[in-house]
From Swiss-Prot:
NCBIfam families: PRK05218.1. SMART domains: HATPase_c. GO terms for molecular function: ATP binding; ATP hydrolysis activity; ATP-dependent protein folding chaperone; unfolded protein binding. Gene3D superfamilies: 3.30.230.80, 3.40.50.11260, Heat shock protein 90, C-terminal domain, Histidine kinase-like ATPase, C-terminal domain. It is found in: Cytoplasm. Signal peptide: none annotated. This is Chaperone protein HtpG. Belongs to the heat shock protein 90 family.
Length: 640
């Protein structure tokens, strides 16, 4: 590298400047991870060269042995991490090193809390491991040339980790990238070769490429002839030695891999600072042969419910990296799963379009789905306290994502149902499965009852539960946005029908005695004039008014007919910008309630009728159509 052009100065994207400050402070408690991150990036660069080299063998430039090298220079106080991978063009260096190249950057920055552990995890998830070099360096120089470009199209990128960086065009004979860290005075212990080798073996042993360092030999001090040497030192040679095992971890036998190695591979793969909850490593043989190493993270990524959420599966073919985010290999409701799939059958030039049509991919996807559900089922059924805690953590983080599978995966719907957990009218903890509920059903109970609402508190205090509480019948409480949608695809569990207590008529069968049924019939007949008058007064808001079969303490509640969308689902669809068919709820009134009894003969019948309706709307989590009119009616009634 000799010639260079004039220096051009650029400013960092505002979020990057903030991030650089954060990196040097929040991550300082675990500084050695900088080496893991930079070696991982170097390995990725070599993977990308392998992939592009399939169609462009000239990119190898007579240097086909891919590797990563770590060099220590005590005199200049630098560590250099270099690779002979794909390299960067000048524009790529400006774009990739000066911005966070990911949508949702502002959302990312808003989630930073100042807490070292949680912020470190966020930083890793957003793929900005390069900046971890500033944990130990007060200046970073990057020298690179992209494969396929001429030698004089190299680039040098320099930054002191503040608000700007400079870029120069240089001549670089070899392709690839060298990252030169100019160490701060408090980080000079990373110039110790033995320490660096330990860090490489700890974090990066599984990297499939050789990671090399200059070999050192012991050289005794020179002494006069006949005298015994009293000391010596290690000196570097021109020979490079491989520090790591240099074999892809997933290709090894499970018996040869320690738990710590599995965890470090996961952290390197995902840039997650937390250990995974569980993993499954298998070689699948048959018509379609592949190796799968799948992980369940301990924490959901910040974008899991956004359109930007990507599947965390890397696809390899015969150990050649093909693509990140291979979403065809895992169903969308398992998008939280991270890992590696290495296929023996797919072509090396496979495209995302081909993945959609491939029979082998369909087989791999089905196999991955079964394996993940089996892994989760094992945690759920385990009597080991640690496994139980892992499943509880999993469900807190990913339960709502898993529920999407009820509508997406008919084949595995029963398996998914068995993994779901809910609070109930008898217990607040979200720990009751459908099987648990069924085992606790009252004698004579014919259905599994549930109620859905916008929050756990709203579900627990739903007016529709009053009769069930009076009868001592347990009801499942569903309080997540996805619940109402998901339950549209489920009609029974293990032969027992599911019944939404806010839909249709309530029939408790043998749990409701003949006298109660007779009393309800008499009340309906007695209040028919009031019901007719209410029907007329609320004709624009309700499709029907009827005497309730489910209320005890509340004056009224809203219900929907079987097969119709609930108010919660209507609100959710509208918030998502989807068209919703017009529908009106059914208003059920409680003839035993004083407010309802006051309707008969009231001079303010219409006002009272509308207040009762609006209160029913509020009770199920909605808002009155005209809040101002509601307040006006309340005030008018209070003054009487």
């Amino acid at each position: 590298m000799t010639e260079q052009t004039a220096t051009q100065n650029y400013s960092f994207q505002a979020e990057v400047a903030q991030l650089l400050h954060l990196v040097t402070h929040s991550l300082y408690s675990n500084p050695e991870i900088f080496l893991r991150e930079l070696i991982s990036n170097a390995s990725d660069a070599c993977d990308k060269l392998r992939f592009e080299g399939i169609n462009h063998p000239e990119y190898y430039e007579d240097d086909a042995n891919l590797r990563v090298r770590v060099s220590l220079d005590k005199e200049n106080k630098t560590i250099t991490i270099s690779d002979n991978g794909i390299g960067l063009s000048q524009q790529e260096a400006i774009d990739n090193l000066g911005t966070i190249a990911k949508s949702g950057t502002k959302d990312f920055m808003s989630k930073l809390t100042g807490d070292q552990k949680s912020d470190a995890q966020l930083i890793g998830q957003f793929g900005v491991g390069f900046y971890s070099g500033f944990i130990v360096a007060d200046k970073i120089t990057v020298e690179s040339r992209r494969a396929g470009l001429p030698a004089n199209d190299g680039v040098r990128w320099i930054s002191g980790g503040t608000g700007d960086f400079e870029v120069q065009q240089i001549t670089k004979d070899s392709r690839g990238t060298s990252i030169i860290l100019h160490l701060r005075d408090d980080a000079l212990d990373y110039l110790d070769a033995w320490k660096v080798k330990q860090i490489i073996n700890k974090y990066s042993d599984h990297i499939s490429l050789p990671i090399e360092m200059q070999k050192e030999v012991w050289q005794e001090e020179e002494v006069a002839e006949g005298e015994e040497p009293k000391g010596g030192q290690y000196v570097k040679t021109d020979e490079w030695e491989v520090i790591n095992s240099a074999s892809a971890l997933w290709t090894r036998s499970k018996n040869e891999i320690s738990e710590e190695q599995y965890i470090e591979f996961y952290k390197n793969l995902t840039h997650d600072f937390d250990a995974p909850l569980a993993w499954s490593h298998n070689r699948v043989e048959g018509n379609t042969e592949y190796t799968q190493l799948l992980y369940i993270p301990a924490k959901a990524s910040s974008d899991i419910f956004t359109r930007e959420a990507k599947a965390g599966i890397k696809l390899y073919v015969k150990r050649v990296f093909i693509m990140d985010d291979a979403d065809n290999l895992i169903p969308n409701y398992l998008r939280f799963v991270k890992g590696v799939i290495d296929s023996a059958d797919l072509p090396l030039n496979v495209s995302r379009e081909l993945l959609q049509e491939s029979r082998d991919v369909k087989t791999i996807r089905e196999g991955n789905t079964r394996r993940v559900l089996t892994l989760l089922d094992g945690l759920a059924k385990s009597e080991d306290e640690k496994d139980q805690e892992k499943f509880k953590t999993f469900y807190q983080e990913f339960g709502s994502v898993l529920k999407e599978g009820l509508g997406e995966d008919f084949t595995n719907r029963e398996r998914i149902l068995k993994l779901l957990r809910y609070a109930t009218s008898n217990q607040d903890e979200i720990s009751t499965s459908f099987a648990d509920y069924k085992a606790r059903m009252k004698e004579g109970q014919k259905a599994i009852y549930y109620v859905s609402a916008d929050s756990l508190a709203a579900a627990k205090n739903s007016p529709q539960l009053e009769l069930f509480k009076k009868k001592g019948i347990e009801v499942l409480l569903m309080s997540e946005r996805v619940d109402e949608w998901a339950m549209n695809f489920v009609h029974e569990f293990d032969g027992t029908p599911l019944q939404n207590v806010s839909k249709g008529a309530v029939d408790l069968g043998d749990l409701q005695d003949a006298e109660e049924k007779k009393a309800l019939e008499q009340a309906a007949e007695q209040f028919k004039p009031v019901v007719d008058k209410l029907t007329d007064a609320l004709k624009d808001k309700t499709k029907e008014v009827r005497v309730t079969t489910r209320l005890v303490d509340s004056p009224a509640c809203l219900v929907t007919s079987d097969g119709e969308l609930s108010p919660q689902l209507i609100r959710m669809l509208k918030q998502a910008g989807q068209a919703v068919p017009e529908s009106k709820p059914i208003l059920e009134i409680n003839p035993e309630h004083p407010l309802v009894q006051k309707l008969e003969g009231s001079a303010q019948f219409d006002d009272l009728a509308n207040v009762i309706f609006d209160q029913a709307v509020i009770a199920e989590g909605g808002l009155p159509e005209d809040p101002a009119a509601y307040v006006k009616r309340i005030n008018s009634l209070l003054l009487k």
